[in-house]
Amino acid sequence: MWSLGNEVRTNLTGGDYSSSEITSVCTMVNSAVKALDSTRPTTMGNNAPGGNLAALMAIVDVVGINYNSNNQTYQTDRPIYGSETTSALSSRGVYAVDSANMAYPSYDNKAVSWGNTAAETVNAYLSSARSCGHFVWTGFDYIGEPTEWNKYPAKSSYFGIVDTCGFPKDIYFMYQSMWDSRPMVHILPHWTHESGNIDVWLYSNCASVELFLNGVSLGKKVLSQRGTKNQYAYTVAYAAGTLVANGYDASGNLIAQDIQYTAGTPAKLALSSDKTAVSTASDDLVYITCNVQDKNGTLCPNADNSVVFTVVGGTIIG
């Protein structure tokens, strides 16, 4: 598809879709696009109902609606899709709002006022007979728009399915459970806490899941329908040890597993690389991941040790 624009009302006279300028400009741009390439449909992202929106929807071939999961309210014979949706807020590895560090929980339970959680959006579009699907804002976190803190030292957005380093947040596994046919199950959060009742969520595409704490079953849950039901919630009284999630097929066979261990005191660093060899060429680049682990090799999720890196034969660039 060729897009004529996104939320263009903000750049037009009057600043909204009631401006007559918007339809004339979009008609002109649509004609120009069709003259250059008539083989692909045109679209645009609209973020407000009312005004000349009906006229705009008649100009393009495919109607893009931003942040309105209930697109049944739009009266048009054109195909409809979510051109920008969700804007859920989360920080990788954080499981409660952390005001001091300006971080949001990795549970899928917070979104901007005009958006929705990831699960809410997915469920809405799965249940819609009108929509072709939706684009999520955003796949990656990015520098800028640190909504809703919007002040120093926050400098990165919180919308991403993965963070700015490319590491998946927990919500990544919800999407995986929806669109990947390979059996999987994912536990959140980590299992290194002090005490109390912990909200444990599982994402899985298996027919059923079962959670174990130190070998004791905490119950089996069955997939009732595709959608947000791919998320399973437990409340678990914390006890140090091993948390295991099993995923089973319809016949009860174990086909997927995820394990979280309680970490001990930080004892060592573990490095891994995205390449097996590095060229001496000046433009070669390698990404090194560093994990803080206890003596048994378990990731220490709460470690805040100060680490200094030095490189011989290369340069640290970020």
Regions found by a protein language model. Name each.
Residues 1-225, 231-238, 242-254:
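Extended substrate-binding grooves/exosites of carbohydrate-active enzymes
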Residues 159, 210, 216-218, 303-317:
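Short, well-ordered beta-strand segments
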Residues 191-196, 277-286:
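Short, solvent-exposed loop/linker segments at the N-terminal edge
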Residues 263-281:
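Low-complexity, acidic Ser/Thr/Pro/Gly-rich terminal tails and inter-domain linkers that flank the onset
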